[in-house]
Amino acid sequence: MLLPAANVIMQLAVPGVGYGVLESPVDSGNVYKHPFKRARTTGTYLAVATIGTESDRALIRGAVDVAHRQVRSTASSPVSYNAFDPKLQLWVAACLYRYFVDQHEFLYGPLEDATADAVYQDAKRLGTTLQVPEGMWPPDRVAFDEYWKRSLDGLQIDAPVREHLRGVASVAFLPWPLRAVAGPFNLFATTGFLAPEFRAMMQLEWSQAQQRRFEWLLSVLRLADRLIPHRAWIFVYQLYLWDMRFRARHGRRIV
């Protein structure tokens, strides 16, 4: 939950996404009610978008669309939103792209240009798997950086969304013993992974002493990453694909 929680904060910093999640009537996607199911759904989507086939993407799109049809603002909502809005989906996809890039950059620094360009072009599927038209995805990394900077001006985390996200960062949805042990550490790590502008919106303080501890944490994660074979990460995504295909064949819900 370390880097993923930080990325969720980034996604929900757009008010339409934040309130869409907060007010969603789809209980099966509520992290506080079904945390492990929520994690499985997210993992499945990332696996399908990155290594899945066109058939896999059609399956996940159909399943997600069923849930998204119920997620739209009402007369009492603080902001107007619709889960099918490609602009909102583009922002979420952009954050997911940053999730993959951040994993590398926090541990090893920037990717080489050729690799970064290839990763970026593949990342468009994070949006086009749903309702983001291919032409809406910024054509290159320079255009993406411009889109990102423009988008920062429209970000805002209101108090209700902030409370929800702080609970996500401190794993408030876990049973008490796990929550008590993992919560403070996960909140610390999540704060470290956030850029300063997101920390400010979350009203999270960060000191030089905390940064030094965070750098130590990164060194531990760097060592762990070097010890775990790359194939192990691919295998985890493959498991998500196998699980989704099994569920589809047997008429069980995918998300």
Swiss-Prot record:
Segments crossing the lipid bilayer: 2-22, 168-188
Cellular compartments per GO CC: plasma membrane
Entries under InterPro entries matching the protein: MPAB/Lcp_cat_dom
Pfam families: MPAB_Lcp_cat (PF09995)
Molecular function terms, GO-annotated: oxidoreductase activity
Key words of the record: Cell membrane, Membrane, Transmembrane, Transmembrane helix
Bilayer topology: Multi-pass membrane protein
Intracellular or extracellular location(s): Cell membrane
Keyword Transferase: no
Keyword Transmembrane included in the entry's annotation: yes
Listed name of the protein: Uncharacterized protein Mb2261
Lineage per the UniProt record: Bacteria, Bacillati, Actinomycetota, Actinomycetes, Mycobacteriales
